[in-house]
Every structure is written in structure tokens, then in C-alpha cells.
């Protein structure tokens, strides 16, 4: 399937960080702020109904600002207290291809405060407890607690944890009417925020020559946000639109699964490892799989490092396998693998340190069909 334009993305980020070390060892206060502007463009390579070859059309214009202030206080050798404040601002401009439902600029902010305490109760038992309060401009107040318990015995670690979650709909999901490659996605101002309860059990064994780890988890979600196909209108068909979707809430959903992995260090400088991940995501309201979920996936990595006098050579190979991705809207996306190789070269000169890096991403040049790359 050929298209009349290419997608192009550009972004810039500006920000700064300040850190103040306190007299008590390992205690400090840190603040940072950053602003990111993200833009997408359609660069036309063929003449179309409304544009000529060479036209540049702004398709997305979004701004994020994030500021936070956190304090880490070592109150005792067995106790560390974390506190903080967060501010997040999101702004979304209407564009030619991503109009707003009311055709107006939209923005939203979220303020949050949190406290978390890490306590070592006994030589083998540690507890982490925390709570976060968030105030969202549109969805008001929300408290989310977390709790974890870890048992350590020699080289064995066992951790059980629980965390509540809260995620507001994005401005794109609430207000935008976006058109891309014959598809329209419509926001819904009436969306509710997602809420979740996450449970996890993790076991790790760390030896000098190898490590193994396994975990099982379950995430119960309420009002999960997902886009569904709502069918095209006669006007859509007349304008060449083949699919129309709208964001909605799923009343009940659940994601559960497990992963198991290992890493081996047979000799100095060399390491390799792999892991397998199984994920089962279900829309419990309709008793079907969650959109765009992948049941089977895995990762492989290997690296080698060697130093000769003032030169150090690093090489790393990383591979990722993704099984069939299920989609009611698009049909299943086929399983695939992606492989990267990277090298880093460190030169430790008398007064200058140089570290050039060379690598290749997607070594085997895997590409997906356009219908499986859309959100």
C-alpha cells in the first residue's frame, strides 16, 4: 500500500537540574525542570487531493513540562525517607490533520506529592511503604499507596509487592480528531481515568558467575482506555477514509503473566543472558483479549569488554523477539525479531577522554506493514 507522504518527527528539550548535599551522609535535595516540544509533519512526495509534492503539513504539536523536587534523607543506618513534589503540564495544539473536538487549544496540569519509607527491620527483612497524592486539573484528587516486603538470605532475594495506580487520559485521547493514512481516530471528553491494582512476586539468585530471576504478576484495571472501531460514515467513504475509531473505557480488564531470565559471566569481561516473558491481557467486560497484546516475547544480550593500555573496546549484541500481536481492529501482526549491535571505543589520553561509538540498529532490516504501525 503506497502513501502520498512520509512521516517526520522532531522534538527539542530544555531543562536543568540542581542538587544540594546535606551534612548527613547520603542525604540530599534535588530539583529539576524540563520542557519538551514534540512535532510531527507530513512531507508530501506525491500530488494528492489537497496537497502538492513538497508540501509540509504539521500533523501534531504537543508540549510537556515536568518539574519535580525530591528529598532523600538517611535518618538511620536502617532507614531512608524519600519525599517529593511533582508538577506536569501538557498542552496540545489543533493542527490541519489533528483537529480538536472544539477546535481549541487544550491543556491540563497535575500536581503530586509523595512520601516513601525504606526500613530494614531485621538483617534479612526490608519493607518499603509509600503513598502518593495527585491532583489533576480535570479529575481532581487521587491517593495511590504502595507496599513491598523483601527477604534476603545469602545470595537469594524474595520480594512481594503491591501498588495502586492512577492514569489520566491524555489530551489526545480526550479531544483530538486525528487523520492518518486513511484512518480517523476520535477522542472522547467523557473518558474516565484508569485505575489499577498491581501485585508482584519476584525471586532472584545472584552468584558471582551467574544470576537467575523469575517473577509472576497480576494487574487488575478499571476503566482501561482503548480505541475501538466504530465503523465509517458515508462522508468517510466519500473522502477515502477506510477506518474510524474512538477511545473508550473498558470497565474491567486484567493483565497477568510471568517472566524468567538468566545472565552468565563465565570469564572477566564477557556476559550473556536471555529472558522469556508471557503476558495474558484480557478485556473482562467482553471476555476477549486486550487490543494489541503480545503473549510471547523475549530478549537476548551479550557483551564483551577488553582493555589494552589506554584503549578499551566494548561490543554488545541485543536481540528482541515479539510474538504475534493480537488486534481486533487490524488483524494479527506477525511475530518478528529485531537485532542491534553496538561498539564503544574508549581512549584514555593524558588530559582528554574520547569515547566514540559505532553501531547498527535493526541489522536484518525488518519492516512492518503500515497497518500494524498505527496506534
What feature does the model see in each segment?
Residues 5-139, 145, 150-152, 210-214, ...:
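Face-selective signature of the C-terminal outer-membrane beta-barrel domain
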Residues 23-25, 74-78, 122-126, 152-156, ...:
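Outer-membrane beta-barrel channels and translocator barrels
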Residues 39, 91, 102, 137-142, ...:
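Surface-exposed extracellular loop regions of Gram-negative outer-membrane beta-barrel proteins
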Residues 120-127, 218-220, 241-325:
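Gram-negative outer-membrane beta-barrel transporters
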Residues 8-14, 61-65, 107-111, 141-143, ...:
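Residues that define the transmembrane beta-barrel architecture of outer-membrane proteins
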Residues 58-70, 106, 110-114, 188, ...:
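Outer membrane beta-barrel strand-and-loop segments of large Gram-negative receptors
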Amino acid at each position: 500500500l503506497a502513501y502520498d507522504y512520509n512521516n517526520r518527527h522532531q522534538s527539542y528539550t530544555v531543562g536543568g537540574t540542581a542538587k544540594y548535599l546535606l551534612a548527613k551522609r547520603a542525604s540530599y535535595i534535588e530539583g529539576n525542570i524540563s520542557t519538551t516540544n514534540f512535532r510531527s509533519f507530513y512531507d508530501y512526495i506525491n500530488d494528492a487531493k489537497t496537497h502538492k509534492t513538497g508540501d509540509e503539513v504539521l500533523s501534531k504539536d504537543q508540549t510537556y513540562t515536568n518539574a519535580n523536587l525530591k528529598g532523600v534523607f538517611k535518618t538511620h543506618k536502617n532507614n531512608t525517607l524519600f519525599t517529593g513534589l511533582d508538577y506536569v503540564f501538557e498542552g496540545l495544539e489543533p493542527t490541519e490533520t489533528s483537529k480538536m473536538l472544539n477546535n481549541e487549544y487544550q491543556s491540563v496540569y497535575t500536581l503530586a506529592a509523595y512520601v516513601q519509607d525504606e526500613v530494614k527491620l531485621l538483617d534479612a527483612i526490608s519493607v518499603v511503604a509509600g503513598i502518593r497524592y495527585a491532583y489533576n486539573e480535570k479529575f481532581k484528587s487521587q491517593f495511590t499507596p504502595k507496599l513491598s516486603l523483601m527477604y534476603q538470605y545469602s545470595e537469594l532475594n524474595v520480594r512481594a509487592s503491591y501498588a495502586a495506580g492512577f492514569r489520566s487520559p491524555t489530551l489526545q485521547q480526550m479531544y483530538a480528531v486525528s487523520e492518518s493514512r486513511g484512518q480517523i481516530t476520535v477522542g472522547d471528553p467523557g473518558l474516565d481515568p484508569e485505575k489499577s491494582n498491581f501485585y508482584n512476586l519476584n525471586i532472584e539468585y545472584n552468584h558471582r558467575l551467574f544470576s537467575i530471576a523469575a517473577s509472576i504478576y497480576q494487574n487488575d484495571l478499571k476503566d482501561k482506555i482503548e480505541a475501538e472501531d466504530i465503523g465509517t460514515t458515508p462522508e468517510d467513504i466519500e473522502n477515502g477514509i477506510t477506518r474510524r475509531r474512538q477511545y473508550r473505557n473498558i470497565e474491567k480488564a486484567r493483565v497477568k503473566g510471568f517472566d524468567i531470565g538468566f545472565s552468565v559471566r563465565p570469564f572477566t569481561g564477557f556476559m550473556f543472558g536471555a529472558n522469556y516473558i508471557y503476558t495474558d491481557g484480557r478485556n473482562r467486560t467482553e471476555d476477549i483479549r486486550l487490543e494489541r497484546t503480545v503473549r510471547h516475547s523475549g530478549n537476548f544480550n551479550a557483551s564483551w569488554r577488553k582493555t589494552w593500555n589506554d584503549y578499551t573496546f566494548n561490543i554488545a549484541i541485543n536481540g528482541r523477539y515479539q510474538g504475534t500481536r493480537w488486534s481486533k481492529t487490524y488483524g494479527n501482526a506477525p511475530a518478528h525479531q529485531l537485532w542491534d549491535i553496538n561498539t564503544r571505543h574508549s581512549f584514555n589520553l593524558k588530559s582528554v577522554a574520547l569515547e566514540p561509538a559505532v553501531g547498527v540498529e535493526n541489522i536484518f532490516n525488518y519492516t512492518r506493514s503500515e497497518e500494524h504501525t498505527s496506534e
